[in-house]
Amino acid sequence: MNISKFEQRTLHALARGGLIRVEKDDKGKIHTATCVTREGWLLADCTVATFRRLRKRRLIASKDGSPYRITREGLHAVRAQLDNR
């Protein structure tokens, strides 16, 4: 699957335990998507457009109103990256 650099970064942060919080306006449309890493840092590459592409491809999902997390398909799509911890 073709995944852009920004989508790859977001998926990698989610695969390591991060989550995406969304804020909706009065009409129920998503206007802000915030990616939070496991350590609590905010990922600047996660925009609403990136969020919509990941959700459209079913690489992320929300369960029972909780924040969005990576799915099994997302784990298979993400490329391995060296972890500099």
UniProtKB/Swiss-Prot annotation:
Superkingdom is Bacteria
The family classification in the record reads: Belongs to the UPF0386 family.
- Signal sequence span per UniProt? none
Stated name of the protein? UPF0386 protein Plav_1374
